[in-house]
């Protein structure tokens, strides 16, 4: 299918087949579509609503074209979300990655610089002194030896350069916001994925099932956060053993006080880094509580504990023992030596 035919199809609110979406994505990723065509297609898809088949097909193309990182073995997990929730919180999932690593997980943290927030995962890690642009072999060593490595999206998905200009010019959420957490170059089987709207909870769980994932928690909080929140109920769509179940959790279930997420907002990368460091140093705060919740979910997704509740307890334990901040220090040292 050529790009103009695809545009005519989606603007009449007809869905693309998996094969058609694959063809169109290959055209976009190879630079054969103009910025206007890319923007038009993304708007058309959003207006009609992207399907599980379309998203999975697009993700497969990006995975196939990505510069891959090869890691194997148990307890592999990623904590990448879609972003776009507008809350401007500090980097919760990034802080969580170090807690999960300290708990025995192996985290392939996929991320990028900020698109819609004050500070992306790449921004805060770079500010901490972590070198972002490593070879796939160096990243694999980080994960194997330290339990955590950062996969800087532009280094692995060079073909998305053709989409950057139209996405920035449009300034709205598109298919590519959904693709970030679906296209980890290490093909991680277990994930915690935060989404910007509850309409995507079960669909993204099924997309990840189609992509071969095994244990996934797709989360969205009632206060709008694309993380497990301390300010409201959080809905979770859990993929496990080929089935998806949906349920709600509250911070009180885990002995955590409910606090407005406005207390977690930041205005700069440095402010986000300061909070991340305080959390990893186990300073009591709402920030530490929300990291414990989200790290606990990833510990559970990585199959290190049999329940989410035990995952949160394990997260709090490694924080109290100072092991999470040791992982941050180790990653800084390792990457600076590369």
Swiss-Prot record:
A GO term, aspect molecular function: magnesium ion binding
Residues annotated to bind 5-phospho-alpha-D-ribose 1-diphosphate: 81, 84-85, 89, 91-94, 109-117, 121
Annotated binding of Mg(2+) 1, by residue: 93, 227
Cofactor: Mg(2+)
UniProt-listed InterPro entries: Anthranilate_Pribosyl_Tfrase, Glycosyl_Trfase_fam3, Glycosyl_Trfase_fam3_N_dom, Glycosyl_Trfase_fam3_N_dom_sf, Nuc_phospho_transferase
SUPFAM superfamilies: Nucleoside phosphorylase/phosphoribosyltransferase catalytic domain, Nucleoside phosphorylase/phosphoribosyltransferase N-terminal domain
Keyword set, alphabetical order: Amino-acid biosynthesis, Aromatic amino acid biosynthesis, Glycosyltransferase, Magnesium, Metal-binding, Transferase, Tryptophan biosynthesis
Pfam families: Glycos_trans_3N, Glycos_transf_3
Main enzyme class: transferase
Residues holding anthranilate 2: 167
Family as reported in the entry's similarity comment: Belongs to the anthranilate phosphoribosyltransferase family.
PANTHER family assigned to the protein according to its UniProt record, in alphabetical order: ANTHRANILATE PHOSPHORIBOSYLTRANSFERASE (PTHR43285:SF2)
Name of the protein: Anthranilate phosphoribosyltransferase
């Amino acid at each position: 299918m050529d790009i103009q035919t695809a545009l005519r199809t989606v603007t009449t609110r007809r869905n693309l087949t998996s094969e058609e979406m694959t063809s169109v994505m290959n055209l976009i990723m190879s630079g054969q579509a103009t910025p206007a065509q890319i923007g038009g297609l993304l708007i058309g898809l959003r207006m009609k609503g992207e399907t599980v088949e379309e998203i999975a097909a697009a993700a497969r193309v990006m995975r196939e074209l990505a510069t891959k990182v090869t890691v194997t073995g148990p307890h592999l997990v990623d904590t990448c979300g879609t972003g776009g929730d507008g809350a401007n919180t500090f980097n919760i999932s990034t802080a969580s990655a170090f807690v999960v690593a300290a708990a025995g997980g192996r985290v392939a943290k996929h991320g990028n610089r900020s698109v819609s927030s004050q500070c992306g995962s790449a921004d805060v890690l770079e500010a901490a002194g972590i070198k972002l642009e490593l070879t796939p072999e160096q990243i694999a060593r980080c994960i194997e030896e330290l339990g955590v490595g950062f996969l800087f999206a532009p280094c692995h998905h060079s073909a998305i350069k053709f989409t950057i200009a139209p996405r920035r010019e449009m300034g709205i959420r598109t298919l590519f916001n959904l693709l970030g957490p679906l296209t980890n170059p290490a093909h991680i089987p277990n994930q915690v994925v935060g989404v910007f709207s509850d309409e995507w909870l079960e669909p993204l769980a099924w997309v990840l099932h189609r992509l071969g994932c095994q244990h996934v928690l797709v989360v969205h909080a009632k206060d709008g956060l694309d993380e497990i929140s301390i300010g409201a109920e959080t809905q979770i769509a859990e993929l496990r053993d080929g089935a998806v179940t949906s349920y709600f959790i509250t911070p009180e279930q885990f002995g955590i006080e409910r606090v407005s997420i406005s207390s977690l907002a930041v205005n700069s990368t440095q402010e986000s880094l300061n909070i991340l460091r305080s959390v990893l140093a186990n300073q009591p705060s709402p920030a530490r509580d929300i990291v414990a919740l989200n790290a606990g979910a990833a510990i559970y997704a990585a199959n290190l504990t049999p329940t989410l509740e035990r995952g949160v307890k394990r997260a709090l334990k490694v924080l109290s023992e100072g092991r999470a901040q040791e992982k941050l220090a180790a990653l800084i040292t390792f990457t600076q030596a590369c």
